[in-house]
Amino acid sequence: MSQEPSIHTWPGSYYINSEKRWASGVLSLSRTTLRFASEQKQESLMSLKLSRIMEIKMESSSIIFSALTVLEQGNLKHWFGSLRPCRNAVYHVLEHFWRERLLSPSEPQGAEAPLSKGQELISLISGAQRRLEDTGKVLNHQGEQFDNMIQGLDKIESDLTVADKLLSELECPSWWPFSKMPWRSHQEAKSEAAAKAACTKGSGKIQKVIVSIPAIVFRDGNTGNMKPGSLTLLVSSLEVREANGQLLHCFEKEEVDDIHVFNPYEISIRQRFIGKPDICFRLLSARMTEALSVLEMQYKKKVEVTRDYAVFRSTSATTPESPESGGNVWAAGHGQDTEVPVEVPAGELTQLQLQVLQPTVTEAEAQELKQMLQQLKNLALEAETELERQDEALDVLSCSTDHATMNINRHTRRMRKLL
């Protein structure tokens, strides 16, 4: 049976626990499997279905400074080190495809003995709970930083108030009979009004979003800076954003020069310039097929399919009955969204009916799930409260910073006039 083509590969090393040694080779990610092959003999040292992965983490050990670990069902942990271009890039790509695999509504059951539905849910919720706890710690630390920044701005405001009083003393000495010195003008009032008008300037029109998908974003040629983000297709533009929503670049429809499709999960978008470097972003996404159909309609003359894409289409065509190829998210090529009906023999129909009627979650698992969901709900509510508080703190910081900047500029102009 032919091996699935790789979506992405990384040179690195794998720890063979039975031999207590590290082996160099290549880590490869395919549509359904994570593999590691040795560099010398080209033999597979590890092959793991994405559906069996429970957790992906970045860790450190006494043997190697930094490593990437993959926890398999059965509490079996795989260690990867010396990953190039960097560990963070590999982590972001693996986590993205693994998460999309978990969230896929058409996730198939593997050929090996699978866990029950209740155990799968417990495993998924426990992972989400751990991540939410880590997020809560980060949010608390971030909130403390915001509080320190607000205290610092309050101190700056008090210092500016003292500076204003001292400048007023210098501008209007007690021996001067008038309220203002003759060299003062109305320029300050005009500049302040202009600054306020700039702050209250309205934003532009909001375009309609056609489709938005999560993706791994990086500049073409800089694979070491892979980070999670998103690709948003609008009516007249394309937006590439970071995971926090910050806009990296907006390609207007007429500015896009070419879109290369490397495989069903990876594309590049380029805007060419004369006399300066081109702007080119490369995007990896497990849901890229959702965007490809729109891109082919909007940019049909600019979309170019590479030869690597044909490998994925031919592989999927030769293995239509693969148990791991289900759903449009994991279809290897465009146009495989339709499911082929399977004929069931009459003798096996009763067995299928009995299998459907069997309970998928036991009462004990349901009780455990209920408790875990309650804990997850409490953590989410605490995180939401902290986020709302930090949103208010950010508004205060923004207003205080603008006010302090305006006062500093005004005091600077006043001091220059006094010199």
Curated annotation (Swiss-Prot):
CDD domains from the UniProt entry: SNARE_SNAP47C, SNARE_SNAP47N
One example of a Gene Ontology biological process annotation: exocytosis
S-S bridge residues: none
Record SUPFAM superfamilies: SNARE fusion complex
Top-level taxon of origin: Eukaryota
Boundaries of every t-SNARE coiled-coil homology domain copy: 108-170, 356-418
InterPro entries given in the database record: PH-like_dom_sf (IPR011993), T_SNARE_dom (IPR000727)
GO cellular component annotations of the record: plasma membrane; presynapse; SNARE complex
Keywords: Coiled coil, Repeat
GO MF annotation list: SNAP receptor activity; syntaxin binding
Coiled coil (residue ranges): none
Cited function: May play a role in intracellular membrane fusion.
Family: Belongs to the SVAP1 family.
PANTHER family in the record: SYNAPTOSOMAL ASSOCIATED PROTEIN, SYNAPTOSOMAL-ASSOCIATED PROTEIN 47
Stated name of the protein: Synaptosomal-associated protein 47
Protein source organism: Danio rerio (Zebrafish)
Gene: snap47
